[in-house]
Amino acid sequence: DARAQATIDLLAVLAYGELEAFERLSQDALLAPNMGEREAVTDMAVGEYGHYKILVDGLRARGADPQAVMAPFRRPIDEFHASTAPADYPEALVKIYVGDGIAADFYREVAQFLEPDAKALVDEVCDDLGHSAF
């Protein structure tokens, strides 16, 4: 049904976004001015990969092939991040906090219309971004 497909689409775009965030944060960590900040950004990257795995499991539990359902979102997400690549560490921090915060707020709002288990999955991922710990 349409609602089930919309749920899969939302989980898929969020999953691919988390995978891309892992890759992006791994690169951003290299821009850090000291080892402490590099470790903190790397920890965030690891968290994003954990979110990706949670979402992939959620997709599989709904009978979806994660790679297939994420495929339509790859190009637009990759293009967005390529066009907003940070030039230095301060720009990377702005993107981490502002951009990712806006995305998390958007996903939380859309999740209000999902079935309770799917909403809980999105909330779990968005609530555990860990950026405030940095």
What is each stretch, according to the model?
Residues 1-12, 73-96:
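Acidic/His metal-coordination segments adjacent to aromatic residues that form catalytic metal sites
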Residues 44-71:
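Conserved alpha-helical segments that form or flank metal/cofactor-binding pockets of metalloenzymes
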Residues 1-12, 39-42, 53-57, 105, ...:
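His/Met- and acidic-residue-enriched segments that coordinate or traffic transition-metal cofactors
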Residues 21-42, 84, 100-117:
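Helix-loop segments that flank and shape redox-cofactor active sites
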Residues 2-32:
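Basic/polar, acidic-poor N-terminal "presequence/leader" segments
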Residues 7, 34-37, 66, 89, ...:
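Residue-level recognition of alpha-helical structural elements
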Residues 108-134:
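A contiguous pocket-lining binding segment that forms or flanks enzyme active sites
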